[in-house]
Amino acid sequence: MEEMFCFQCQETMNETACTVQGMCGKSAACANLQDALIRASQYAALYDTASDEQLMNNLFMTITNANFSTADIRRAIEKTYTGKSVEELTREGCLKNRKETVRSLQELILYGLKGLCAYLSHAAVLGFRKAELSSFVRSTLVYLLEDHEQKEYLTLLDKTGEMGVQAMALLDEANTATYGQPEITTVSLETGSRPGILVSGHDLHDLKELLCLLYTSDAADDLLCVD
């Protein structure tokens, strides 16, 4: 059985890491390919072999519950960096030989980048982009390839949080410019008689497409939105 080591979310087995299969349902093969994709993205940022959009999509793809398709992840690796095999990229991504505190800071920064890229991706779908944020993602991926002092990682961690706030502001601008300001609305809390589609998240573009599909095709489903 293939081994894995995934500890990027709060659902991990025994509050340490998932080592056989993710509590989220992610397979070991998927987890290892995601590690390889992150490493490929770092090399792509270093050698300029992938676009900012590709790097953004790569990181977004690896957040919890975003994409468990091993075929999709392999294709993303092939588009991103081909200088090393998937096996080599996976081994390098394990971060075995680094100090625990440094490794933890690197991972925390990386998870911040993943969230940042999720916001950037949603904003980009609506036509909103910010070069400074894309440049930060690229430069930080390269920075994480190198060895630095703990205090330098702490400084970068603060900067990552700052950039994350800017990404949220960009997404808010994209959403309100496209759909208007949110308004408090009265909704029914009664039990419905039809099947329902439960939506969680903030991809308003896809949500609009789904709503249009449901209400123009007279589908026998209700749409429930939760954030």
Name every feature range the model reports, one short phrase each.
Residues 182, 204-205:
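Short acidic loop-to-helix transition motifs that present clustered carboxylates
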Residues 206-214:
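Histidine-anchored nucleotide/phosphate-binding helix
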Residues 2-181, 186-194, 198:
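Long, compositionally biased, glycine/small-hydrophobic-enriched stretches that function as flexible linkers
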Residues 215-222:
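Conserved small/polar residues in nucleotide/adenosyl-binding loops
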Residues 196-201, 209:
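Core alpha-helical transmembrane segments of integral membrane proteins
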